[in-house]
Amino acid sequence: MAALTDADCLVVKIGSALLVDRDAGGLRQAWLASLAQDVAWLTRQGVKVVLVSSGSIALGRGILKLSDTDLPLEQAQAAAAVGQIRLARAYEEVLAPHGITTGQVLMTLDDSSNRRRYLNSRATLKQLLSMGVVPIVNENDTIATDEIRFGDNDRLAAQIAVTVGADQLVLLSDVDGFYSANPNIDPTAQRFDEIGEITPEIEDMAGDACSGLSKGGMKTKLMAAKIATAAGCRMAITEGVVLNPLRALNEGAAATWFRADTDPQAARKGWIAAMKPKGTVHLDSGALAALRSGKSLLPAGVSHITGHFQRGDPVAIADGAGHTVGHGLVRYTAEEAGRIMGRKSNEIESVLGYPARAALIHRDDMALTIQNGD
């Protein structure tokens, strides 16, 4: 078991069935207040926390007095629009007394599959966390359609964990872990304390969702575990219905942990290094020295650009002799990079005509093959 207090960044997924009283259609206020206590406790330990919360459609359904059956797309989107305001306010009200500022972030599948938007969402989330803000993330159900939606917040939570480089992900569920069979119908079902590899046999054990409010079942949780662990993030499934569920997990409550065999930073750098570059950014000796010391690549250190690339595309990074020294995800198009190369960061806006980021390639989006002293 991993201690939550050991995490640098923790992502917590909260399902509709935990947050919303199915019969009354309102929030489970006492439970939400206890969750806020847990978040405050973790932030005091120096842990950065991101909450991925369902509940907007379930809340809006109750406010609009819609049926509790599957809703047509238009009604679901209307319910999300109404419920999202209530959901954001609820988190603000329970966390503010602990001195915690919240920020709302709405995502769609496009925001992770499109590299440019992925980099933008990553930068925003990282900035919020650096300022001590607890982001409240939800799928943007008001505009998402079947073609551009995650479909469940288990996978969204895993993608957010990858995006922010979290080292732990907790899925608060209506069961206390992953079982060999459905424990509600099979008395011989056994819970796994830890799973090191998601094999075909493990996948065959997963069932489907049975809750009237939640869309996520064990199959989606396994998908989330694959996404998270491949990026170096450990993941836990634990029962969330109890009060103070995060503190309970930290103190040894029943759960299933999915092991990650690498750390988030190493996994991300391996992912970047494996991409086929769309172009090359050539550096001067000063920029090369800066990269060796762990700095981001600024336009001032670029001598010339080759290839055709868009924002978010992978590029090779080369020294003055043309030798590849790394790879990175670039924050500018080839045309923009050509205009600002050799320029100081405070000149970028005047050259491009609009505000822009200081780094051409941020150090978090870079995988180098050189080391200090090379």
From Swiss-Prot:
What are the binding positions for ATP in this chain?
A: 13, 173-174
Kindly state which keywords UniProt assigns to this record, in alphabetical order.
Answer: Amino-acid biosynthesis, ATP-binding, Cytoplasm, Kinase, Nucleotide-binding, Proline biosynthesis, Transferase
A single GO molecular-function term is:
glutamate 5-kinase activity
Recorded hits in PROSITE patterns, A to Z, give: GLUTAMATE_5_KINASE, PUA
Q: Which CDD domains match?
A: AAK_G5K_ProB, PUA_G5K
Q: What is its EC number?
A: 2.7.2.11
| Reaction catalyzed | L-glutamate + ATP = L-glutamyl 5-phosphate + ADP
What pathway, per the record?
Answer: Amino-acid biosynthesis; L-proline biosynthesis; L-glutamate 5-semialdehyde from L-glutamate: step 1/2
- List positions binding substrate: 54, 141, 153
| Signal sequence bounds | none
Q: Which Pfam families match?
A: AA_kinase, PUA
Report the record's Gene Ontology biological process terms.
L-proline biosynthetic process
Does Nucleotide-binding show up as a keyword for this record?
yes
Does Aminoacyl-tRNA synthetase count among this protein's keywords?
no
Q: Tell me which GO cellular component terms the UniProt record holds.
A: cytosol
Q: What does this protein do?
A: Catalyzes the transfer of a phosphate group to glutamate to form L-glutamate 5-phosphate.
The family note in this entry says:
Belongs to the glutamate 5-kinase family.
Q: Which NCBIfam families match?
A: proB (TIGR01027)
Stated name of the protein: Glutamate 5-kinase
Q: Which organism is it from?
A: Roseobacter denitrificans (strain ATCC 33942 / OCh 114)
Q: Which gene specifies this protein's sequence? A: proB
